[in-house]
A protein has these predicted regions:
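Acidic, small-residue rich beta-repeat scaffolds with periodic aromatic anchors
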Residues: 4, 83-85, 93-183
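Beta-strand C-termini and the immediately following turn/loop, strongest in propeller blades
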Residues: 61-64, 116
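Short, surface-exposed coil-to-beta transition loops
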Residues: 42-43, 59, 71-74, 139-142, ...
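Beta-propeller blade termini
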Residues: 41-50, 142-149
């Protein structure tokens, strides 16, 4: 993963290079992404098959925002294809926040925060954490992460009840490939 330095710790104009070097049999493949940017710290790079086609994909998690108690990410997936030449194609990935909005219903009644995920219901009493002034409704997304594990892409984000973000739990989303995007 190669990028130009923008300013401070920020980087932009990314190039993904796969293969190459002395041991390369097929040569290297490079893909340029001039609109990608990373605000701080090092991005995460993974090389794993996450759509069960037997071909390793490139997963890049860029930091889109960072500060005290905040770390938001932008996820990019390059699916490897052979048609008949080996290449990588960027495919859409639903953001963790969009996935949570679609899959999770959060509500607050008194001291209790309820998360409805499908048919499962989770209830947390936020006062047991020592928080006094909750946000209504509870929020998500101040800390985000994406990572593949055993061939599956996961996204996680936190649930908070006060500003600054007072964590009461995390939500983990398992992504699947529907042939057009990861959701």
């Amino acid at each position: 993963l190669i990028a130009d330095k923008a300013d401070g710790m920020a980087t932009k104009n990314f190039t993904v290079q796969v293969g190459g070097g002395v041991d390369s049999v097929c040569g290297e493949l490079t893909c340029n992404f001039p609109n990608w940017s990373n605000s701080k710290f090092a991005p995460k790079l993974f090389y794993e098959d996450i759509n069960s086609d037997g071909l390793k994909d490139v997963i890049v998690a860029l930091i889109s925002g960072a500060g005290t108690g905040i770390s938001t990410k932008e996820i990019h997936v390059l699916n490897q294809v052979h048609d008949p030449y080996r290449r990588y194609q960027e495919v859409p990935v639903e953001s963790i926040n969009d996935a949570v909005q679609r899959l999770v219903k959060l509500e607050q009644k008194g001291n209790e925060i309820t998360a409805l995920i499908g048919k499962k219901k989770y209830v947390v009493d936020y006062t047991k954490f020592g928080y006094q002034t909750p946000v209504n409704p509870p929020g998500v997304g101040a800390i985000e992460n994406y990572e593949p594990y055993n061939g599956i892409l996961y996204g996680t984000t936190n649930v908070f009840v006060t500003i600054p973000e007072a964590l009461i739990g995390n939500i983990k989303v398992r992504y699947t490939w529907d042939g057009k995007m990861y959701r």
